[in-house]
Amino acid sequence: MALHQPKSVKEALSYTPGVSVGTRGASNTYDHLIIRGFAAEGQSQNNYLNGLKLQGNFYNDAVIDPYMLERAEIMRGPVSVLYGKSSPGGLLNMGQQASDHRTAQKKFSLKPVLTACSRLVLTLAMRWMMTAFYSYRLTGLARSANAQQKGSEEQRYAIAPAFTWRPDDKTNFTFLSYFQNEPETGYYGWLPKEGTVEPLPNGKRLPTDFNEGAKNNTYSRNEKMVGYSFDHEFNDTFTVRQNLRFAENKTSQNSVYGYGVCSDPANAYSKQCAALAPADKGHYLARKYVVDDGEAAKLLR
């Protein structure tokens, strides 16, 4: 991750054997993975942070920025026996960056980066060993970018303070926290086969920046997490460990998404498509609202 600087955890895992990450194209709204052919109903059943499950639901799942992590691990196979309800294919565990008493140095870095797609990234990393027993780490990030689809934007601001107390070689207590605000999470939709893989009835294809949503689509998310990790080694055989975390996630979503072209049999009973002439149905994309399940049609040009 330090070498490739991925925008999301799923992007960091794109070359992992047995893991599929492209179910939503270029969208980084969620880290949905398919492991060994199995997909979880929601990533909150399948994604862990510091050994604890990231609680949530399908539209209110937490997402951790890869810059805040020191590792991302894939556990393949049916792991429900050990970890509870999860996908038969396996699960994802992420390890957050924490202060390390072995890093006996002061380090501070502030890096602004401007990349393709008008992407501006400002990162902050600071760690310091205060004494032989105490150390802390502060990691932050601010990112703003235009998404591939026209009118879509990504904004993320995150900070993760960590503090470690290590009174001896056998005892370790680490305070971990993570705060993230995303006023805009970017594009979260999909395009129809007609106009992309296959041409439209008029022989044309949709532009690569085509957005099937509405101009006022909004999708914001706010995450707060506070917890600790404690372990004490009594001897070579017995060790006590305890992890605890309190988390609060809030999302606000009001968006329109594509539901296939009107000529698709799945949309035969759609009110918006039924009003069209048969010759026009191949030119219109059926759409629905996430919030109130309303409907609206959009002309494909």
What label would you give each PLM region?
Residues P112, M126-W128, W165, H232, ...:
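Residue-level signature of outer-membrane beta-barrel architecture
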Residues R143-A147, A160-R166, K170-E233, T237-T239, ...:
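Acidic/polar loop-and-plug regions of large Gram-negative outer-membrane beta-barrel proteins
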